[in-house]
Amino acid sequence: MIEPTGVDGGTVSAADWRQVTDLPMQMGIVGSSKTDLQAKINALETLLEAARRRQRFYSGPRVYIQLQLDGEANTWRSEILAARLELVADALNLWPSAATEARLNITRRYFWERTTTATAKSSTTITNNASNRLTLDSILGVIPTPAILDIRNNNGAAINFRNFYIGNDVEHGFTGTEHRVAGGTYSYGAPITHNNLVLRSDVSKTVADKCAGGYFHMLGGFSSLPAGIYVKERLFVYVGVAELAQLADGPEIVSTGQQLVDFGVWQIPPGGISASSGISFYLSAVAGGSGTITLSFLQLTPARDFLHLYNRTYNIPDGGGVVWDGGTQEVYSINAASTARYATMQHMAGGVNLYPGKSNYLYVLCDEGSGTYTDTRQLDVTVTYRPRRLTV
C-alpha cells in the first residue's frame, strides 16, 4: 500500500510504497517418513532464518517467494523480509502418517520482479561526446526498476578508464544535443584574482523551460584545465546579452589537471520557475600564474537518476568493461571473454532506474586515469533489467 505522508487534502509529496504482509498461507507438508517430515519442516525454518539474517546483517543470499500465474510463461519473485512458520491446532494428529498442516506468515517486498531479465537495449556503440545517449523505449512492467549496465571498451586497446558518470532523462525530453551547453576558451597571462568570471555558457530559454526546475549534475568537459587553480560555476539570469543577477553558485574545486569535473547539483531554473529569459553559467577562477582554460561543454545530467562509478586502477582491455547491477548494488570490472570479474570498481554515488511507459534517455560519460577526457572514445553499452509489478 502507499504510505501517506502529506496532510489531508494536500499534496502527498513523499508518497512511497510500504512492504507487504501477506495473509497467512495454509499449507500441507508431507514426508516419506516421520523423520523426513521433520527434516522438511526444519529445512523450511532454516530458509526463513536465512531471510531474517539477510535483513539484519546484510549477509548471505536473498530468499524469495515465487509466483507463476496460470497461463503465464514468466515466473515472478518477491524477496522475503520476515517470516514465521506455525503448526496449526491439532497438526500433530496427522503426524503418524508423516503429514502435518502449517501456516506460513510472510512480510515481503512491495513488488514482484521477473526471475529472468529483459533487454532494454542490446549492445550499442556510443561515443564519449555529444553522441553519448541511448534511447530506451518499451520498458516492461508497472513501476520503475533498477538498470543493469554492461559497458565495454571498444577502442582497439586497453584503456585506463577512471570515472563513469551515467544519468537517465525521463522527465525533460532533451533532443539532439540539448543536454550539452557550449563552453569557450580563456587565456590569462597574469594571475587571476579571486572570483574572476572567465567563461560564459548560455542555457537557452527552450532548454531552461524543459529543465522545468529539475535538479542536474553539471559535468564540465575541458580540453585544458591547468592544475593548481581554483574553479567554480555560478548561475546568472540574463536578457539578451546582459546579466541581471547571480542566482546561485557551486562549490569551489581545486584542479588537479583533470578534464572532466562534476560541478555539483543545480536546480535549473532556480526556484522551479518557468524561464522568462535565458540563464548563463559562468566559470570563475583563481590562478597564480599564466595559462589557458578551455571548457568544451557543460552536460546537464538529471540528478534523480544519476550514477557515479570509479575504477581504482584496472586497465580495461579491449572488449572488457564494467558491469553494474542496480538491483543488487554490485559493480565489478570484467575481461573481454566475460570469464573473470575483478574488484577494481567502486560505487561512488546514486543509481539509475528505468521507467515503464516513458522514453528513457541514458547518458554515459567517462574520463581516464591520468585525468584525461577523450571525446573520441567508444563504448559498447548493453542495458538489461528485471521488470517489476505490484500485483499480477
PLM-predicted stretches and their roles:
Residues F161-F164, V231-V241:
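Short, surface-exposed beta-strand/strand-loop-strand elements in extracellular ectodomains
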Residues V20-D22, G141-P146, V207-L219, G228-Y230, ...:
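Extended extracellular/luminal ectodomain segments enriched in beta-structured repeat modules
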Residues G240-A275:
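Extracellular carbohydrate recognition and processing domains
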Residues T127-L140, G183-F216:
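Short beta-strands within extracellular/lumenal beta-sheet-rich domains
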Residues L134-D137, S201-K205, L219, Q258-P270, ...:
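Exposed aromatic-hydrophobic patches
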Residues V170, S201-V237, L298, V364:
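Extra-cytoplasmic beta-strand recognition segments
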Residues M1-D169, F222, P226, P251, ...:
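Extracellular/virion structural assembly segments
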Residues V142-I148, D262-L298:
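Extracellular beta-strand ligand-recognition surfaces/modules
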